[in-house]
Design a protein with these regions (language model features):
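Positively charged, small/polar-rich N-terminal and surface patches that mediate targeting and assembly
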Residues: 1-94
Length: 94
């Protein structure tokens, strides 16, 4: 059913040197809260920032457009997630 589809959330991890610009744009354009995680590359040990955001399935295409507008080579990892807790309720679809 369409309502089931709209309610499905996706967790997205994004790795890019342009993490500041991307995270600000995701907040402004998608209206979603963004978390910056601190990571380390296993091979070289380089410190890296990872953007973590939860969006609906219907927002994935827009998210990719925003990210690739800043960094075409950004690593984007997407997976299904069940979300509970304050601030992660259903969002109106326009």
């Amino acid at each position: 059913a369409l309502m089931d589809y709209i309610g499905e959330f996706q967790k997205v991890n994004i790795i890019s040197g342009k993490y500041k610009e991307i995270s600000e744009a995701l907040t402004d354009r998608l209206g979603r809260g963004v978390t910056i995680l601190y990571g380390e590359g296993a091979y070289k040990g380089n410190e890296t920032k990872v953007i973590y955001v939860v969006v609906s399935r219907l927002e994935i295409a827009k998210l990719k457009g925003v990210v690739h507008g800043f960094d075409e080579n950004a690593l984007i990892s997407i997976g299904s997630v069940e979300v509970t807790g304050k601030g992660h309720g259903k969002k109106a679809i326009h």
